C-alpha cells in the first residue's frame, strides 16, 4: 500500500506513473528551437529565426542588378552577466550578426567583386536559463498565447426572424480573411476581410470558372442539350439552368493610341429558370446558340438550390466582368485595366507574398475537407474554395456538423519562439525595404553589405515588443511556484486574441478537451476568469502549437505499461474511450474490473474493459502544478481549490521555511525545475563549502577530459539576499558538507521557500478548530505569541532605492555627504560619496544617498561674489536633492552600489591607452595558450590518421584529403572555429570527438573574446548607464517583517483569513498533556465552504508529526479515511483529531471536543505594514486643490457623499464645514487656519472652496456668463 519515495510515504495506488516533463520546457525549448544556436548552421531546421531570414532573403534591387544573400547567423556572448544587468538596469542581450553575401548579376559591372561580410544587426534580448528575459533591469516573462488556429471554420448563427444562417471562415497565418455565408434568401456570398460582399459565383468566375456552365458542372447540376429544333421540342416544360446568351465582338478604334480594339458583348436571350415553351425554343434556334443547359431532374438538385439562387443574384457573366466587379467592390474605384483587376484576387489569396496559411492552416484544411494538398502549398487553391463551398452546402442540408470553436483542436498556442519569429519578420521586412532603397540609390559606386544595413531597425521592433506587448509581463517572483506558474501560463488575451469585454461565457468555460491539457481549477478570479489558464502537469505543446497530453495504449483490455506513453492532441483523442489511471489491474496491466467508467468526448459511458482504447497516465494529469500541490484536493469544492492554488503563489518566502508534513509528492520537482536552486551537474565530491560558495570536484572519464577545456572542479556562488521583482528576498544556504559525495541532479542548497530540495511555502502549525472569545469571527485568525517570538512567520523583504546623477544646464550634480542646511547627526552614516553605510539602521526621513544639485538664481552682486570668494560659502548655489527614506520605511542597509561612466581628461586617456595595450597583450597570451591546448588535444585524437578533406563554412578545403596529420599542419590552421564541413577522419566516432572538441573550443574562444571586449569597454566607457546619466547610486535595504495583527494568512485549501489577535502563549487553549496550540481557526469556515481537505490534512499532519514522518498524498489518488485512521491509531492520536481542550486563561475544560491537528499555513504577500498609512501634510491636486489619494501619493482618505450625509444626519455642521473647506480645498482658508493654530488665535471664517471655482470655469467653458455678486 505505502511505498517509500524520497523519505515521504506515498499513498498512491497507481502503478508506473511516468516522470514529469521539464516544467519550463514550454519556454526554454521554444526559445532554443527559435534561435537554434546549439544546432550546426547546415543542420538548422526551417523554423524560427532561420526561417524568418530565409523568407526575407535574398534581397535584390528593382533592376535585379545586385543580390544580397543570407548565408548564416550567429551571436556573440552577452557583455554583462544576468545579475549585472539587473543591478545596472540594463537588458540582458546578445549581439546578432549575419553573414551576408553581396554580388552583382549585371554584366556592365564586372569590376564589382562578390563580398561576404559579417554584419551586425542589433542586440537581441536573450532568454536566461530559467526562461525569463531581463529587460531594463527587470525580469520579464513572455506568456504563451492561446488563439484561433489558422484553417477553415464552419459555424451557424440565427437571423432575427429565426432563419439559420451558415458560414465558413478561412483564417490564414497572414493575409486577408475570406468568409462564405448564406443569407435569409438562401443566397451564398463571399466576404473578403469582413468588408464587401459578393456572390460566391462571382468569385468562381474570377478564379477561372467563367460561364454558368462551368459553375454548374462543378456541382453536377445541369445537363447540356445540343440545340436543334426537333431536339429541343421534347424538353418543353423543363427549366433552364443557365442564361442563354448571344455573344459577339465589336471593334472600335482607341482614340489615344489609334489601335483597333475588340470588345466582347453579351445579350441575354432567355434568363435562368425560364420554363421552355415553343416560343423560347424558336428564339434559341434563331440565336445561333450551340447548346443550352437544363436543370437535372434527380434528387440532389434540391440540395444545391442555393447555387441557382446565387446565380440569379450574380451580376456578372464572364471572368472579365467578375474580376472587374471584385476590383470595384474592394477598391471602390474603376479598374485601370483587366490585368490589374485580375491581379487583385491573385495577390489576395494565391500569392506567397501576401497570403500564407502556414503549415498548421494547410494541415487543418486538409484534415477538415479530406484533401491531400501537399504541406508546402500554403496558399489557397481553387480546390480548397470549391470544397469549402460544397461542405457548406452539406451543412445547410444537415449532412455535416458545425465546428466547436472552443475545442482545443481549433485553438493553438503561440509560444515565445513563435511570437519572436513574428516580430523578427516585421523587423526584417522593414530592413529589407531600406536595403532595397539603398541599393537603388547606389548604382555604380562600390558598396558593401554593411553600407546597406541599419542595425536600429530590427532592435527597435524587438525592444518595443518586450517593452510594450501585452504578453511580455513583469514576472511574478514572490516564490518559486509563482515564477514557474507564470512561465506556464496561457492567455487568450493580447494582440490577435480576445478582449475581456468581448469574451463570452463559452470561451471562458471548461471544455472536455481541456482534460490533461489546461487546468480546470487554476485561473484568476475576476474579469479574466477562464481567459488565463495554466498548462496541465504532463501537457506539452507540439510542433504545430496544439497541446498534447499522454495516455497509455490499451489492447484487448491489457494496458501497455512498458512503452513510453503516447502523446495525443485534442483532435487525435476524438472518439477514443479513455479509462482512468487508477482502474484495477494486475501486475501485467490486465484490467481486472468487470466494467470500467470511461471518458469519451464529453460523455462517461460504462463499458467492457476490452473496448477501452487508452488509460490516463496519472490521476493528477488533469490539474496544473499549483492544483497538484494541494493535498486531498478531491475533498475540496472547486471554487475554494481555485483560491487555494492562486494563494500559494502569493506565499512569502520565510526565514526558516519548512516543507509540509502532508504533501503531494510534487514538491521536489517544482523546486528543482524552478531553476532557483543549484543542482549537481554530475557525480563528484564536495571539495569546499561556506555560506557563499560550494566547490565540487566532478568524476569525469578520459574521453570527456579529452574534448573539454574545463577543469574537474567547479565553483558555485550562492545567492545572498537578492531582491526579487516583488520585493521578497532570495537567500540560499548550503545543505552539503565537505567530503560529501553527490550524484547528478542532487540539490546542493536550500532557501527561497525551499527546504532540503522541496518546495516549502509555509510552516506546519498545531491548530484547533474552535471559536475563541469571538476573535476568530468571520475568518479571522487567533495566533500564539510563540509563533511571533520564534520567528516562525518572519520574512525578509528587500527594497532598492536608486538616485541618478545627471548633467544639468547649470552644471553637474554631485554625490556628497556635505549637504547644505543639514545637521551632522543626519549625515553621520554617509560616506564621502554620500551613500549610507552598510549595516546602518534606517528610519523614516533618514538620508539614504546625499546629492546636491546646482540651483538657478539671479546673478549675485559683485559684493556677494567677493564675500563668497573669501568665506567660501557654497551653500548659496546648490540645493539639497538627497534621497530620503519614505514614511513607513524601517530597515537595515544591506548593500550599496555605485556605477559611474569613465571620466575623460588628458591624464586618464593616457592611462587608458596603457591599460588597453597591457590588456591586449594579456589576452593574446590567453588566446595562444587556448590554441596550443586545442592543437595538443586534437593531435592526440587524430595522430597517425589521414585527413578526409576538412573545409570551412565557405566550402574552401583547409586540410586536403589524403594528407597525414602532423602537429605542424594543425598549427598552420588559422581559424578552427569555422571548420564546419567535410570529414576529419574515416570513422564516425573519432569525427564526433573532434567535432565536440572544436565545439567546446568555440565556446571557450567566444567567452575569452567576450571577456576581452568587456574589459576594454570597462576601461574606455566605464559602467554602461542610460543616456544622460553620469552616475547611478543604489542602496538595498532589508526589512524584517514579523507576523502582525492585520497580516493575511491562508492554508492550501482556499481557507484564508486575517490575523485578528496575537495571544500570550499561556492563554492559548491547550491539550490534555499541556501543549498549547499555535493557531485557532473558526470551525464555521469549513462546512459552508466545503473544503474538507483541510480537516484530512490536519488529522494526518498530527499523526505525521508524532511519528516523525512526512507523507505524499497525490490528488485523486490520496490516502483514504481508513488509511488515515490506521496511521492515527499507530501514532496514538485520537481519530478525526477529536480531542478535549482546556482554556488557557482559567484551566477549565471546554464543553465540547474540537478538531485538533497540524495544518500547513502560509503568510501571504498582503502585509499590513504595506497598507497602513496616515497623512499629515502632503501634496494637493493641482486643479481641484484637494488632497491626493492613496499611500503612494501620501494622500488622504476621501470623505465622500455618504459620509457627508452621516454628518448632516448628526447635525455636526461645524465639523462638516471644516471638512469641506479648510481641511480640503479652501486654499486661503487653510493657510490662515494653520497660522491661527500656530499663534493660538481663534479660527478664521472659511473662504470659497476651489472646487466651486472649478465648477464656475466648467460652466464658462460651456459659454455661460456667470458672475458672483455680493
Swiss-Prot record:
Pfam families: RNA_pol_Rpb2_1 (PF04563), RNA_pol_Rpb2_2 (PF04561), RNA_pol_Rpb2_3 (PF04565), RNA_pol_Rpb2_45 (PF10385), RNA_pol_Rpb2_6 (PF00562), RNA_pol_Rpb2_7 (PF04560). Gene3D superfamilies: 2.40.50.100, 2.40.50.150, 3.90.1100.10, DNA-directed RNA polymerase, subunit 2, domain 6 (2.40.270.10), RNA polymerase alpha subunit dimerisation domain (3.90.1800.10), RNA polymerase Rpb2, domain 2 (3.90.1110.10). One of its GO terms (molecular function) is DNA binding. Keywords: DNA-directed RNA polymerase, Nucleotidyltransferase, Transcription, Transferase. It catalyses: RNA(n) + a ribonucleoside 5'-triphosphate = RNA(n+1) + diphosphate. One of its GO terms (cellular component) is DNA-directed RNA polymerase complex. GO terms for biological process: DNA-templated transcription. It is an enzyme of class 2 (transferase). InterPro entries: DNA-dir_RNA_pol_bsu_external_1 (IPR019462), DNA-dir_RNA_pol_su2 (IPR015712), DNA-dir_RNAP_su2_dom (IPR007120), DNA-dir_RNAP_su2_hyb_sf (IPR037033), RNA_pol_bsu_bac (IPR010243), RNA_pol_bsu_CS (IPR007121), RNA_pol_bsu_protrusion (IPR007644), RNA_pol_Rpb2_2 (IPR007642). Its EC number is 2.7.7.6. NCBIfam families: PRK00405.1, rpoB. DNA-dependent RNA polymerase catalyzes the transcription of DNA into RNA using the four ribonucleoside triphosphates as substrates. The RNAP catalytic core consists of 2 alpha, 1 beta, 1 beta' and 1 omega subunit. When a sigma factor is associated with the core the holoenzyme is formed, which can initiate transcription. PANTHER family: DNA-DIRECTED RNA POLYMERASE I SUBUNIT 2. Belongs to the RNA polymerase beta chain family. This is DNA-directed RNA polymerase subunit beta. It comes from Flavobacterium psychrophilum (strain ATCC 49511 / DSM 21280 / CIP 103535 / JIP02/86). The lineage of its organism: Bacteria, Pseudomonadati, Bacteroidota, Flavobacteriia, Flavobacteriales. The gene is rpoB.
Amino acid at each position: 500500500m505505502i511505498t517509500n519515495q524520497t523519505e515521504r510515504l506515498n499513498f498512491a495506488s497507481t502503478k508506473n506513473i511516468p516522470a514529469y516533463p521539464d516544467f519550463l520546457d514550454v519556454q526554454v525549448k521554444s526559445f532554443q528551437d527559435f534561435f537554434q544556436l546549439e544546432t550546426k548552421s547546415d543542420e538548422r531546421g526551417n523554423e524560427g529565426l532561420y526561417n524568418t531570414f530565409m523568407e526575407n532573403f535574398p534581397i535584390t534591387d528593382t533592376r535585379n542588378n545586385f543580390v544580397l544573400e543570407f548565408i548564416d547567423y550567429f551571436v556573440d556572448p552577452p557583455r554583462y552577466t544576468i545579475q549585472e544587468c539587473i543591478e545596472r538596469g540594463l537588458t540582458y542581450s546578445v549581439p546578432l550578426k549575419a553573414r551576408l553575401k553581396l554580388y552583382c548579376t549585371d554584366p556592365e559591372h564586372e569590376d564589382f567583386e562578390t563580398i561576404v561580410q559579417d554584419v551586425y544587426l542589433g542586440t537581441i534580448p536573450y532568454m536566461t536559463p530559467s526562461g525569463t528575459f531581463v529587460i531594463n533591469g527587470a525580469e520579464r516573462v513572455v506568456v504563451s498565447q492561446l488563439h484561433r488556429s489558422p484553417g477553415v471554420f464552419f459555424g451557424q448563427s440565427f437571423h432575427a426572424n429565426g432563419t439559420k444562417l451558415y458560414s465558413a471562415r478561412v483564417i490564414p497565418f497572414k493575409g486577408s480573411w475570406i468568409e462564405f455565408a448564406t443569407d435569409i434568401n438562401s443566397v451564398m456570398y463571399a466576404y473578403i476581410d469582413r468588408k464587401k460582399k459578393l456572390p460566391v459565383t462571382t468569385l468562381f468566375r474570377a478564379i477561372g470558372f467563367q460561364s454558368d456552365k462551368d459553375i454548374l458542372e462543378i456541382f453536377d447540376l445541369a445537363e447540356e442539350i445540343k440545340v436543334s429544333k426537333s431536339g429541343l421540342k421534347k424538353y418543353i416544360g423543363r427549366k433552364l439552368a443557365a442564361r442563354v446568351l448571344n455573344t459577339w465582338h465589336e471593334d472600335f478604334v482607341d482614340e489615344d493610341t489609334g489601335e483597333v480594339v475588340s470588345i466582347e458583348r453579351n445579350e441575354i436571350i432567355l434568363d435562368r429558370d425560364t420554363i421552355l415553351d415553343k416560343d423560347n425554343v424558336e428564339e434559341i434556334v434563331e440565336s445561333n446558340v450551340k447548346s443550352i443547359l437544363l436543370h437535372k431532374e434527380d434528387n440532389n438538385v434540391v440540395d444545391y438550390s442555393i447555387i441557382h439562387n446565387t446565380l440569379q443574384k450574380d451580376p456578372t457573366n464572364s471572368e472579365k466582368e467578375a474580376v472587374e466587379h471584385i476590383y470595384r467592390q474592394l477598391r471602390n474605384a474603376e479598374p485601370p485595366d483587366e490585368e490589374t483587376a485580375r491581379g487583385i484576387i491573385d495577390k489576395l489569396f494565391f500569392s506567397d507574398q501576401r497570403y500564407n496559411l502556414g503549415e498548421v492552416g494547410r494541415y487543418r484544411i486538409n484534415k477538415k475537407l479530406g484533401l491531400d494538398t501537399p504541406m508546402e502549398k500554403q496558399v489557397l487553391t481553387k480546390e480548397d474554395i470549391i470544397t469549402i463551398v460544397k461542405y457548406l452546402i452539406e451543412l445547410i442540408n444537415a449532412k455535416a456538423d458545425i465546428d466547436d470553436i472552443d475545442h482545443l483542436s481549433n485553438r493553438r498556442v503561440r509560444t515565445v519562439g513563435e511570437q519572436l519569429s513574428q516580430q523578427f519578420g516585421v523587423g526584417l521586412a522593414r530592413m529589407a525595404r531600406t536595403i532595397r532603397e539603398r541599393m537603388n540609390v547606389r548604382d555604380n559606386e562600390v558598396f558593401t553589405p554593411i553600407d546597406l544595413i541599419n542595425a536600429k531597425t530590427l532592435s527597435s521592433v524587438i525592444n518595443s515588443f518586450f517593452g510594450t506587448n501585452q504578453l511580455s509581463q513583469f514576472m511574478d517572483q514572490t516564490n518559486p511556484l509563482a515564477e514557474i506558474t507564470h512561465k506556464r501560463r496561457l492567455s487568450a488575451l493580447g494582440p490577435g486574441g480576445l478582449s475581456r469585454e468581448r469574451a463570452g461565457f463559452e470561451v471562458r468555460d471548461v471544455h472536455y478537451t481541456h482534460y490533461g491539457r489546461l487546468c480546470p481549477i487554476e485561473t484568476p478570479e475576476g474579469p479574466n476568469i477562464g481567459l488565463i489558464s495554466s498548462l496541465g502537469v504532463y501537457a506539452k505543446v507540439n510542433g504545430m502549437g496544439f497541446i498534447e497530453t499522454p495516455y497509455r495504449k490499451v489492447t484487448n483490455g491489457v494496458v501497455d505499461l512498458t512503452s513510453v506513453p503516447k502523446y495525443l492532441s485534442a483532435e487525435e483523442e476524438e472518439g477514443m474511450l479513455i479509462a482512468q489511471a487508477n482502474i484495477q489491474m494486475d501486475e501485467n496491466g490486465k484490467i481486472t474490473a468487470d466494467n470500467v467508467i470511461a471518458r469519451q468526448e464529453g460523455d462517461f459511458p460504462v463499458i467492457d474493459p476490452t473496448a477501452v482504447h487508452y488509460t490516463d497516465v496519472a490521476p493528477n494529469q488533469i490539474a496544473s502544478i499549483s492544483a497538484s500541490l494541494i493535498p486531498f484536493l478531491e475533498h475540496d469544492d472547486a471554487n475554494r481549490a481555485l483560491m487555494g492554488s492562486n494563494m500559494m503563489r502569493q506565499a512569502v518566502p520565510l526565514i526558516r521555511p519548512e516543507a509540509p508534513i502532508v504533501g503531494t509528492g510534487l514538491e521536489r520537482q517544482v523546486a528543482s525545475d524552478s531553476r532557483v536552486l543549484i543542482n549537481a551537474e554530475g557525480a563528484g565530491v564536495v571539495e569546499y563549502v561556506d555560506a557563499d560558495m560550494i566547490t565540487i570536484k566532478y568524476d569525469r572519464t578520459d574521453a570527456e577530459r579529452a574534448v573539454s577545456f574545463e577543469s574537474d572542479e567547479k565553483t558555485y556562488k550562492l545567492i545572498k539576499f537578492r531582491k526579487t521583482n516583488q520585493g521578497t528576498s532570495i537567500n540560499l544556504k548550503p545543505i552539503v558538507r565537505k567530503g560529501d559525495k553527490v550524484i547528478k541532479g542532487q540539490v546542493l542548497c536550500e532557501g527561497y521557500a525551499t527546504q532540503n530540495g522541496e518546495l516549502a511555502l509555509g510552516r506546519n502549525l498545531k491548530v484547533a478548530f474552535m471559536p475563541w472569545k469571538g476573535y476568530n469571527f468571520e475568518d479571522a485568525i487567533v495566533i500564539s505569541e510563540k509563533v511571533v517570538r520564534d520567528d516562525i512567520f518572519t520574512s525578509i523583504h528587500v527594497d532598492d532605492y536608486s538616485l541618478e546623477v545627471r548633467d544639468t544646464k547649470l552644471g553637474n550634480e554631485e554625490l556628497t555627504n556635505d549637504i547644505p542646511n543639514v545637521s551632522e547627526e543626519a549625515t553621520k552614516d554617509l560616506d564621502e560619496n554620500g551613500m549610507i553605510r552598510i549595516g546602518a539602521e534606517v528610519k523614516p526621513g533618514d538620508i539614504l544617498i546625499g546629492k546636491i544639485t546646482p540651483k538657478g538664481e539671479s546673478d549675485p552682486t559683485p559684493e556677494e561674489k567677493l564675500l563668497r570668494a573669501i568665506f567660501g560659502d557654497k551653500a548659496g548655489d546648490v540645493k539639497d536633492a538627497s534621497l530620503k527614506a519614505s514614511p513607513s520605511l524601517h530597515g537595515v542597509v544591506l548593500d550599496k552600489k555605485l556605477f559611474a561612466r569613465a571620466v575623460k581628461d588628458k591624464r586618464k586617456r593616457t592611462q587608458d591607452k596603457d591599460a588597453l595595450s597591457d590588456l591586449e597583450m594579456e589576452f593574446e597570451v590567453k588566446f595562444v595558450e587556448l590554441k596550443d591546448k586545442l592543437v595538443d588535444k586534437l593531435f592526440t585524437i587524430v595522430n597517425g590518421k589521414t585527413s578526409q578533406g576538412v573545409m570551412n563554412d565557405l566550402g574552401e578545403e583547409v586540410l586536403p584529403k589524403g594528407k597525414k596529420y602532423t602537429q605542424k599542419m594543425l598549427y598552420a590552421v588559422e581559424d578552427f572555429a569555422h571548420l564546419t564541413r567535410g570529414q576529419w577522419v574515416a570513422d564516425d566516432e573519432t569525427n564526433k570527438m573532434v567535432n565536440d572538441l572544436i565545439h567546446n573550443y568555440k565556446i571557450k574562444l567566444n567567452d575569452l573574446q567576450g571577456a576581452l571586449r568587456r574589459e576594454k569597454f570597462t576601461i574606455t566607457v566605464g559602467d554602461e548607464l542610460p543616456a544622460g546619466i553620469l552616475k547611478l547610486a543604489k542602496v538595498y535595504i532589508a526589512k524584517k517583517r514579523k507576523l502582525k495583527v492585520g497580516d493575511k494568512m491562508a492554508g492550501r485549501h482556499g481557507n484564508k483569513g486575517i490575523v485578528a489577535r496575537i495571544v500570550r502563549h499561556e492563554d492559548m487553549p491547550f491539550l490534555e498533556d499541556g501543549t498549547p496550540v499555535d493557531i485557532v481557526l473558526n470551525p464555521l469556515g469549513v462546512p459552508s465552504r466545503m473544503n474538507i481537505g483541510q480537516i484530512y490534512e490536519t488529522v494526518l499532519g498530527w499523526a505525521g508529526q508524532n511519528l516523525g514522518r512526512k507523507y505524499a498524498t497525490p490528488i485523486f489518488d490520496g490516502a483514504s479515511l481508513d488509511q488515515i485512521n490506521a496511521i492515527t491509531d499507530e501514532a496514538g492520536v485520537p481519530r478525526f483529531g477529536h480531542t478535549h481542550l482546556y482554556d488557557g486563561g482559567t484551566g477549565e475544560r471546554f464543553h465540547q471536543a474540537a478538531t485538533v491537528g497540524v495544518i500547513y499555513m502560509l503568510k501571504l504577500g498582503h502585509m499590513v505594514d504595506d497598507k497602513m498609512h496616515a497623512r499629515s501634510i502632503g501634496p494637493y491636486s493641482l486643479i481641484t486643490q484637494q488632497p491626493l489619494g492613496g499611500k503612494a501619493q501620501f494622500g488622504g482618505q476621501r470623505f465622500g457623499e455618504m459620509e457627508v450625509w452621516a454628518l448632516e444626519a448628526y447635525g455636526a455642521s461645524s465639523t462638516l464645514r471644516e471638512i469641506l473647506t479648510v481641511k480640503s480645498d479652501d486654499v486661503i482658508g487653510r493657510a490662515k487656519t494653520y497660522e491661527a493654530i500656530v499663534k493660538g488665535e481663534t479660527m478664521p471664517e472659511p473662504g470659497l472652496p476651489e472646487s466651486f471655482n472649478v465648477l464656475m470655469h466648467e460652466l464658462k467653458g460651456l459659454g455661460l456668463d456667470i458672475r458672483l455678486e455680493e
